[in-house]
Regions:
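A generic structural signal for tightly packed, nonpolar segments enriched in small/aliphatic residues
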Residues: 1-158
Length: 158
């Protein structure tokens, strides 16, 4: 679970130093996401419904599936309920691993400048979609470049 620690630093730095309108991270973060969604879809978590829906629609337009996953308060509580740390980087058990990983990351998204609300943020877990074992209409076998098209469409509208 060391990758999520580096990603957490990146989220915090981006939010605090760059004053973004929104933050989107992509990572081959959890095997649990592969168990949940296989190799057909990336998991998508967000603290902002509009951003989540825009990413989902951009992905659909490009043939890249981003499947919304839950960020229940129980997952956040699990990550902040510790006798020795402010925030845990692993859930208490093996269940819901991709959800608790996203809940961990959410803890490091700061509030916007002059705002009491977190910067809109989305996390795409591409563990199951970053590498293709078979050719499809978008890519041959190997590295897929998953969600480059999605993000391009989201940003440019093209």
């Amino acid at each position: 679970a060391e990758g999520r620690l580096v990603l957490a630093d990146g989220l915090w730095y981006t939010g605090m130093k760059l004053n973004p309108s929104y933050i989107i991270d992509l990572a081959t973060l959890t095997g649990a996401c592969v168990v949940a969604l296989g190799h057909e879809a990336s998991g998508l978590w967000s603290n902002n419904d509009e951003l989540l829906n825009n990413i989902k629609k951009a992905g659909e337009h490009c043939g890249e599936i981003a499947w919304p996953m839950p960020l229940f308060k129980a997952f956040e509580k699990e990550m902040t309920d510790s006798k020795i740390a402010d925030v845990r980087n692993l859930g208490a058990g093996r269940w819901g691993g991709s959800n608790t990983a996203a809940a961990f990351l959410k803890q490091f998204v700061p509030n916007g400048k002059d705002s009491d609300e977190q910067i809109p943020w989305a996390h795409l877990d591409i563990a199951g979609t970053a590498w293709g074992a078979k050719t499809n209409k978008l890519v041959k076998t190997g590295a897929t470049g998953i969600h480059v098209r999605t993000l391009h469409h989201l940003i440019t509208g093209q």
